[in-house]
Every structure is written in structure tokens, then in C-alpha cells.
Amino acid sequence: MVEKKIYAFVQARLSSKRLKNKVTKKIKNKTLIELLLKRLSKSKLINEIVVLIPKKKNENKLEKLIKKKGFNVFRGSKNNVLERFYKASKVYKPNYIIRITADCPLVDINIVNNLIKIIVKKKYDY
């Protein structure tokens, strides 16, 4: 059986209109994005986690933080998030993409794992 490449693509940015730098706000000395990446890392079904951020210079701080924590970063369009996902998928070539937003640090990893099991077992396209 061919192993499926299952990637979590986390969309993130610092330039939120309502709350600037939202993903770097801290809860108990951890940024929201750190909390999220730690949760996602607990999955034994996700092969790789890639954080997709805009190419804008003001996002360099976020890229540095993510890489310091040992995660890959893909940079793409600020305004066209779908294009960012599309281009990242061309680079990483996953069989399945789990889309996660970085401003949601309370993602339940059990739900994510159950979702992965279902999509792989049923051979869903998306």
C-alpha cells in the first residue's frame, strides 16, 4: 500500500484588520500559533505541517517565529489565499490537505484525526 502524504496547511498572517498580530498574542507565555502547532504536532496521521503566510515584508517576524519552532513556511499571495494553498500544494504535493486557520488555537486533534481516517478510508477527493 502506498503511504498517503497528509499535510496540515495552516493559513496565517499578522495583518489582521480587527486585531493586529493576532496569531502572536500570548496565552501563558505561548503565542496562539505556537499553541496551535503544538496541538497539530500531536497527530500521528499528519506527515507535515506547513504554515502559509503572505509574502509581505511585515510577515518576516512571523516566519522567523514559525521556523524557530521547527516548522516549514510557504509564502504566497496576501489577498488570494486560495492561490497560496494551490501553489503550496504544487510545491509539497500532498495527497490530502487539512486546512487550518492559525487564529484557532483550540483545534481538537481527535476530531482532526477522525476526519483524516474518514477521508483516507473513503478515498474522498476533498
Language model: regions and residue ranges:
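Hydrophobic/aromatic residues located in beta-strands of well-ordered beta-sheets
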Residues: A8, I49-V51
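Conserved donor nucleotide-binding strand/loop of the catalytic core
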Residues: K67-N80, K90
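A conserved acidic beta->alpha catalytic loop
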Residues: P54-E59
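Conserved donor-nucleotide/metal-binding helix-loop-beta segment in metal-dependent transferases, i.e.
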Residues: F85-K87, Y92, L106-Y126
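A short, N-terminal amphipathic alpha-helix
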Residues: L32-I49, L62-K64, K68-K69
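Short aromatic/hydrophobic "clamp" motif used to bind/position activated sugar donors
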Residues: I97-I98
